[in-house]
A protein has these predicted regions:
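Gram-negative outer-membrane beta-barrel transporters
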Residues: 215, 329-331, 352-456
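Transmembrane beta-barrel strands of outer-membrane/channel proteins
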Residues: 15-19, 133-139, 220-226, 260, ...
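Outer-membrane beta-barrel transmembrane strands
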Residues: 1-28, 100-144, 188-217, 250-255, ...
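Surface-exposed extracellular loop regions of Gram-negative outer-membrane beta-barrel proteins
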Residues: 175-185, 228-239, 250, 264-310, ...
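Outer-membrane beta-barrel transmembrane strand signature
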Residues: 60-111, 187, 194, 407
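A surface-exposed, glycine/aromatic-enriched loop/edge motif typical of exported proteins
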Residues: 20-89, 143-175
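Signature of Gram-negative outer-membrane beta-barrel scaffolds
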Residues: 104, 130-267, 287-293, 394
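Extracellular loop and loop/strand-boundary signature of outer-membrane beta-barrel proteins
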Residues: 102-107, 120, 155, 189-195, ...
């Protein structure tokens, strides 16, 4: 909704509502072997150490096991696929014994309701200056639960934490996923395992001022905001009987920041630009809870991230060359990271939170476009950057087999950000004439790091193994 108050003042108000539903299925197993043909313990490399020097895995018996696994996978393409007939047969066999399904398909659901009210006032103070003032209020409700998608021919399945059976005796309340409905029978379409909602409330007020002053164009902006979040559990987990059902406390955060950006026209096609910013940013809900599938606990030492950012750039334009050169530096303090993964060695899901983590991001970027002819351009792009942790972090982890937390130090200093090239380059030719557009490009990527597992960087076990100094 737009309200033109006068020819220099305008108020724009927006109301937005959005509901989304997302689900994904997964083949799972219960008190039996992993049926995936690419399960690492079924691959040849798990039996014999081909490239290493571990004598324990280089015996004649290990080599024979390697050959057996290799021959099995190469004998038929069917051996490299899931054998659904075998899974159905296994479930039908245990039906007569009154045992729960050995294999089943679960469905994870993440549904999201988001409502936003925002308003912005724009005031043209002069022909060369503008002031903006606005606010936004956001409410978000995320529903997260798991249902039984397909029992694969089985008759029964109970809402029991089978991962913890080795830790607690059969029949123990600690094994119940929902003490409000103990030993509940799960049919296709029923919820099991976990069911909770995350409620997030946000509000912020912001303002910015822009002005063109001769050869200088600049903008100053600031904002202050509130973030609140809580968890509402729908199941009373046996490992956290008093801290999993119902609403948690609400975590409250005051956030805010300011930034400056400006550019100066030096003439003859040259422009220099500068940007600076500092912000206190509230943690997001997806990293704020220690084990949201199990309890209401927030991550310990949860704080605002402190973010400093800066950028300096130079741009040159003339009839035959367009060039951009820029450098940037950013630092993040008090970062929080959260991961959950299945730890096969102990048959458990592990919930890990890293807090007090400091990071740096810096680099340089160059882009050039040469006009070789009226219809042919040569383009060159390149970047070299760094994105890494500059400190160790506090770690707290919880395994789904037991309801106890472990605190330690994660030795993650100098670990890089994963999944993105820190060095990249591109060369290309662009042809455009007579309605035809043809591009030929060559790209180069380097320093793409794999993600690391915090589990293998806990200080206490590494000290016991004498794998670290001090």
């Amino acid at each position: 909704w737009d309200w033109n108050i006068n020819n220099k003042t305008k108020l724009t108000t927006t109301v937005l509502g959005k509901y989304s539903m997302y689900s994904s299925t997964k083949l799972n197993y219960n008190n039996t072997d992993n049926p995936a043909p690419d399960y690492y313990k079924s691959l040849p490399s798990s039996f014999y150490d081909v490239w290493g020097s571990n004598a324990q895995y280089q015996t004649p018996q290990a080599l024979a096991e390697w050959q057996r696994a290799y021959d099995w996978l190469n004998y038929s393409k069917a051996n490299r696929q899931i054998n659904w007939d075998r899974l159905y047969a296994a479930n039908q066999t245990v039906n007569g014994e009154g045992v729960d399904a050995m294999y089943y398909v679960q469905k994870r659901h993440s549904n999201n309701l988001n409502v936003t009210l925002a308003s912005a006032l724009t005031k043209h103070l002069t022909d060369k200056s503008t002031w903006n003032l606005g606010f936004a209020a956001i409410a978000n409700k995320g529903s997260h639960y798991q249902t039984m998608d397909d029992l694969l021919g089985a008759n029964t399945f109970h809402n029991i934490n089978t991962y913890a059976i080795g830790t607690y005796p059969v029949g123990s309340d600690f094994l119940q996923y929902d003490l409000n409905h103990p030993n509940a029978l799960v049919k296709e379409g029923d919820k099991f395992g976990y069911d909770y909602t995350l409620n997030v409330m946000k509000g912020n007020i912001w303002s910015n001022y822009t002005e063109t002053f001769g050869i200088l164009h600049y903008s100053i902006a600031a904002k202050i905001g509130y973030d609140g979040m809580n968890r509402d559990g729908k199941m009373r987990n046996g490992l956290f009987a008093d801290n999993s059902y119902g609403k948690s406390k609400t975590a409250n955060f005051l956030s805010g920041g300011a930034k400056f950006s400006g550019s100066m026209d030096l003439g003859h096609g040259s422009v220099i630009s500068l940007g600076l910013g500092y912000e206190h940013k509230a943690p997001t809900a997806n990293v704020a809870f220690q084990a949201p599938e199990m309890n209401n606990d927030f991550v310990q030492n949860l704080k605002n991230e402190r973010i400093f950012s800066s950028e300096l750039g130079y741009q040159f334009n003339n009839s035959w060359l367009h060039a951009n050169l820029s450098g940037y530096y950013s630092r993040v303090d008090n970062a929080t990271e959260w991961t959950c993964f299945y730890f096969d060695d102990i048959n458990s899901f592990s919930y890990n939170s890293l807090t007090g983590l400091n990071k740096e991001y810096y680099g340089a970027e160059l882009g050039l476009t040469f006009k070789l002819t009226s219809f042919l351009d040569f383009k060159a792009l390149g970047t070299i950057s760094e994105a890494k942790n500059i400190s160790n972090a506090k770690v707290r982890y919880l395994n789904s087999t037991q309801g106890t937390y472990v605190d330690d130090i994660a030795l993650v200093e100098n670990m890089r950000e994963s999944g993105t090239p820190l060095t990249a380059g591109s060369l290309g030719l662009s042809f455009h004439q007579g309605g035809w557009f043809i591009d030929l490009n060559g790209n180069y990527y380097d320093r793409i790091y794999l993600s690391y597992s915090p589990y293998y960087r806990y200080q206490t076990p590494l000290k016991k193994q004498k794998s670290v100094d001090n």
